């Protein structure tokens, strides 16, 4: 993809997404503990009676009884589709990070430094005048390249570049601990490629309005990027039809929970033989340049999906595949382009799908760019300002206490064998 566009990857999709949920829980738990080191939050009671709604009987509506007071104190803001205690942490954290970025815009950073890059990305996100003036210009070169793609190596190269930069067309890949040998890492291939994420949005009749709204979004994005309206509508319909067939091949959420069924090691030779619509040598070569090399096998999550995807790619006209890639690209890029692109994206993904009433303020959108692109550098800055050494010592002590308590609990279990206890203690 062209270096002109600053785009971010979509959230992890399908089974890979499910497998990373615990990491997010740990991240927010850590953030909560870090923020609790602050004197102000340390005084907050573990159970605040004002968060209850005592006017409701717990046996009638326990949720309202337990959280009614908190809900009254924290009304749902128009930019949210839901709001809970973790969202409070996220909101507080965003304010802190934004303060860091604002401070950086006031200093003279060394050219080429991380500070300068973070500052430039942040200011670029805030510059609505520039973004609206540029319109689709930042993505035109990439779109032109996509519309020249042919089946074979060129298609796989385009897919891989997009997977590394802006999304997961057709399928997703990732490296994580081997589920059968946690001491080694494995290369995973998982189903993906649906613009709306969930197969049910395409296949369930009750979601017909969403499916229509998605088609209208794609047509609008194609028009904004320079396609004639009639052609844009036809292309959008073709893309949705293609994704619907991809959804038919996709596993349901229930099927994705079957870990044993989702563990299917295959050699590279097997991949080439079974799923020959993809040029696996090209994919691995591209990955080896930037991310991971020496792949000799893959764990395929959903073999039947890949069989269906392989057949679908072979029988689909190249023009439809080009527009499909363009749709994947534009839905990822829309939030970082001009206001008309962002509004189109929000009207569908934010308003129609999620029930949000209002766009996120620009400062939050701007703040999220360097926070995503240069997250490790931002994290280092955050820790330096908000997590002093004394708080780290307290956190290490807390973790140590948890390990000790869990170890004692495991040792006292009468239903666990000694061998299993030993393995459990190792994991602590």
Segments (PLM) and residue ranges:
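Positively charged N-terminal leader segments that act as targeting/secretion signals
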Residues: 4-7, 11-13
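Positively charged n-region of N-terminal signal peptides that target proteins for export
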Residues: 17, 22-25
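Sec-dependent signal peptide hydrophobic core
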Residues: 26-30
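C-terminal motif of bacterial Sec signal peptides marking the signal peptidase cleavage site
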Residues: 35-36
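Short, Gly/Pro- and small/polar-rich lid/capping loops
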Residues: 41-50
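Active-site-surrounding "flap" and adjacent substrate/cofactor-binding loops of secreted or lumenal enzymes
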Residues: 57-60, 65-125
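Noncatalytic, helix-rich "gating/capping" subdomain that lines the substrate-entry/channel surface
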Residues: 105-396
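Extended, non-catalytic substrate-recognition/exosite surfaces adjacent to catalytic cores, especially
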Residues: 389-428
């Amino acid at each position: 993809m062209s270096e002109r566009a600053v785009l971010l990857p979509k959230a992890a999709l399908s089974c890979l997404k499910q497998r990373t949920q615990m990491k997010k829980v740990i991240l927010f738990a850590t953030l909560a503990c870090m923020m609790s080191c602050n004197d102000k939050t340390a005084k907050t009671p573990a159970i605040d009676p004002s968060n209850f709604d005592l006017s409701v009987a717990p046996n009638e509506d326990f949720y309202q009884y337990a959280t009614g007071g908190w809900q009254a104190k924290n009304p749902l803001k128009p930019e949210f589709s839901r709001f809970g205690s973790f969202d409070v942490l996220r909101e507080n954290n965003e304010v802190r990070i934004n303060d860091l970025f604002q401070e950086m815009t006031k200093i003279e950073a060394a050219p080429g430094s991380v500070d300068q890059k973070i500052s430039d990305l942040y200011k670029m996100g805030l510059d609505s005048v520039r973004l609206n003036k540029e319109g689709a210009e930042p993505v035109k070169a990439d779109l032109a390249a996509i519309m020249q793609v042919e089946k074979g190596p060129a298609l796989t190269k385009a897919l891989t570049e997009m997977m590394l930069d802006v999304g997961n067309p057709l399928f997703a890949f990732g490296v994580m601990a081997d589920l059968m040998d946690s001491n080694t890492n494995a290369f995973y291939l998982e189903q993906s490629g649906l613009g709306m994420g969930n197969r049910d949005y395409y296949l369930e009749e009750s979601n017909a309005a969403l499916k229509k709204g998605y088609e209208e979004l794609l047509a609008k994005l194609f028009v904004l990027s320079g396609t004639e309206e009639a052609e844009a509508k036809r292309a959008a319909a073709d893309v949705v039809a293609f994704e619907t067939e991809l959804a038919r091949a996709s596993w349901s959420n229930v099927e994705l929970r079957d870990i044993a069924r989702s563990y299917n090691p295959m050699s590279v030779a097997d991949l080439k033989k079974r799923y020959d619509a993809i040029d696996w040598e090209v994919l691995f070569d591209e990955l080896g340049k930037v991310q991971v090399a020496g792949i000799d096998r893959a764990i395929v999550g959903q073999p039947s999906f890949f069989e269906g995807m392989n057949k679908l790619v072979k029988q689909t006209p190249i023009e439809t595949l080009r527009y499909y890639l363009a749709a994947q690209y534009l839905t990822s890029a829309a939030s970082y382009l001009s206001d008309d692109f962002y509004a189109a994206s929000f009207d569908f993904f934010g308003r129609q799908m999620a029930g949000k009433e209002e766009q996120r303020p620009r400062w939050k959108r701007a703040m999220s760019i360097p926070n995503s692109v240069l997250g490790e550098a931002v994290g280092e800055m955050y820790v330096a300002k908000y997590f002093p050494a004394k708080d780290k010592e307290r956190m290490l002590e807390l973790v140590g206490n948890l390990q000790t308590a869990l170890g004692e609990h495991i040792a006292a279990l009468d239903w666990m064998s000694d061998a299993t206890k030993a393995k459990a203690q190792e994991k602590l």
